[in-house]
Curated annotation (Swiss-Prot):
Family per record: Belongs to the protease inhibitor I35 (TIMP) family.
Tissue: Detected in testis, retina, hippocampus and cerebral cortex.
Pfam family name, one: TIMP
Name of the protein in question: Metalloproteinase inhibitor 2
Molecular functions per Gene Ontology: enzyme activator activity; integrin binding; metalloendopeptidase inhibitor activity; zinc ion binding
NTR domain: residues covered: 27-152
InterPro entries (alphabetical): Netrin_domain, TIMP, TIMP-like_OB-fold, TIMP_C, TIMP_CS
Keyword annotations from UniProtKB, A to Z: Disulfide bond, Metal-binding, Metalloenzyme inhibitor, Metalloprotease inhibitor, Protease inhibitor, Secreted, Signal, Zinc
Entries under PANTHER family matching the protein: METALLOPROTEASE INHIBITOR, METALLOPROTEINASE INHIBITOR 2
GO cellular-component term (any): basement membrane
Subunit structure: Interacts (via the C-terminal) with MMP2 (via the C-terminal PEX domain); the interaction inhibits the MMP2 activity.
Induction: After intracranial injury, expression peaks at 4 days post-injury and slightly declines at 7 days post-injury.
Length: 220
């Protein structure tokens, strides 16, 4: 085999290796119910993005500067988080590394869940729950005040295909993907998984607070 042929095979091999490695570097997230996103987050706020700019956030292990996008925000309401209002949100500079793009100018309101960084700052990724406020159902908006918190000790298990089962009484089976082929179905929009007095968990529908009779039921 000639040198040119060997070089061509080597180049093709490197291209194949690159194509196999690249997906591992892309942003990949597992779907979560809005209640799970609320419970997993350090901070959950309703806010508008006022401005954005690229900033340095230290250096990597090779000494290269780490770039992040800084959003200056106007917080409208905090549903979960520190006593101090959030003033700045940080994210990666590209969606390929899970960076989030927000509309700036202060017109579009978002529900934003993410990780606290202290001193009025938080960090968000595409794996966090960030949606336009006006896309939330009335039930979701009301559940942010208290109901989601009532079920943070429960486990929401996503059903990817039938059959699927719960393995313990403190689980709620999330069926939206099976029934509607969507992760933003009826259970996401209108239900919360609530812990009851016997320690079990069950789906509760509606915007009104759960009645004592629901909390006291022993069998889901």
């Amino acid at each position: 085999m000639g040198a040119a042929a060997r070089s061509l095979r080597l180049a093709l091999g490197l291209l194949l290796l690159a194509s196999l490695v690249r997906p591992a570097d892309a942003c990949s997230c597992s779907p979560v119910h809005p209640q799970q996103a609320f419970c997993n987050a350090d901070v959950v706020i309703r806010a508008k993005a006022v401005s954005e700019k690229e900033v340095d956030s230290g250096n990597d292990i090779y000494g290269n500067p780490i770039k992040r996008i800084q959003y200056e925000i106007k917080q409208i309401k905090m549903f979960k988080g520190p006593d101090k209002d959030i003033e700045f949100i940080y994210t990666a500079p590209s969606s390929a590394v899970c960076g989030v793009s927000l509309d700036v100018g202060g017109k579009k309101e978002y529900l934003i869940a993410g990780k606290a960084e202290g001193d009025g700052k938080m960090h968000i990724t595409l794996c966090d729950f960030i949606v336009p406020w006006d896309t939330l159902s009335i039930t979701q908006k009301k559940s942010l005040n208290h109901r989601y918190q009532m079920g943070c000790e429960c486990k929401i298990t996503r059903c990817p295909m039938i059959p699927c089962y719960i393995s313990s009484p403190d689980e709620c089976l999330w069926m939206d993907w099976v029934t509607e082929k969507s992760i933003n179905g009826h259970q996401a929009k209108f239900f919360a998984c609530i812990k009851r007095s016997d320690g079990s968990c069950a789906w509760y529908r509606g915007a009104a607070p759960p009645k004592q009779e629901f909390l006291d039921i022993e069998d889901p």
